[in-house]
Amino acid sequence: MKLSIIIIATSLVIAVVAFPSKDSKAIENDKTEQRMEIVVQETARACSKQIGDKCKRNCECCRKTVVCGTIYVGGKEVNQCMDKTSDNAILNGLGKGMNFIENTFSFCV
């Protein structure tokens, strides 16, 4: 009796693992579409905005460590060019390094 319960339980576990649900496929397709949209949105443009100006993309912001970041003013989302990431000097330096890497892979002209 115990052997049959173990065999049935093992079979159910194998079935669950072997046959993924349709929902996981849908989520994977959504991720692929999102990646494709990001690539299309990040088109090459010359920089035209300075720190504090409103922006839509990283390529619009001038300087190597400046990115188009999001802040919230009065509960509204505002995108603007910024390079400061923290009041802590060490964390700010690391943040600027990350901004530099992000801009390197933006392929801006």
Curated annotation (Swiss-Prot):
GO terms for molecular function: ion channel regulator activity; toxin activity. It is found in: Secreted. Residues 19-46 form a propeptide. Keywords: Disulfide bond, Ion channel impairing toxin, Knottin, Secreted, Signal, Toxin. Residues 1-18 form the signal peptide. The presence of a 'disulfide through disulfide knot' structurally defines this protein as a knottin. This is Hainantoxin-XVIII-3. It comes from Cyriopagopus hainanus (Chinese bird spider).
